[in-house]
């Protein structure tokens, strides 16, 4: 299982999202100082009712908590878009 697949599986289990996309952007950062550690760069868009009533920082903290130690060991950078289903529907196309 790739890191991106593991991230997707972990987030699906933790948040039961209506929409989830995980992009591995590690290749875009080849030669970057942080890439030397082997940690990957990922972009995640996740839509879940679990984010209702939470501010942006709390949503991000919930995702970090779900990913646990991987945030320190295997993930160097993580760009997040965390939305509720209502926010997702109101989002411009």
Predicted segments, located by residue:
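N-terminal/domain-start segments enriched in small and hydrophobic, helix-friendly residues
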Residues: 1, 48, 74
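N-terminal first-folded block
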Residues: 1-35
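A generic structural signal for short beta-strands and their flanking turns/coil linkers
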Residues: 16-18, 38-42, 74-78
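Solvent-exposed beta-strand sheet faces enriched in polar/charged residues
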Residues: 23, 45-47, 81-83
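A short, structured beta-strand/loop element
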Residues: 31-48
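Beta-rich strand-turn-strand
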Residues: 54-55
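C-terminal structural segments of small proteins and small subunits
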Residues: 61-93
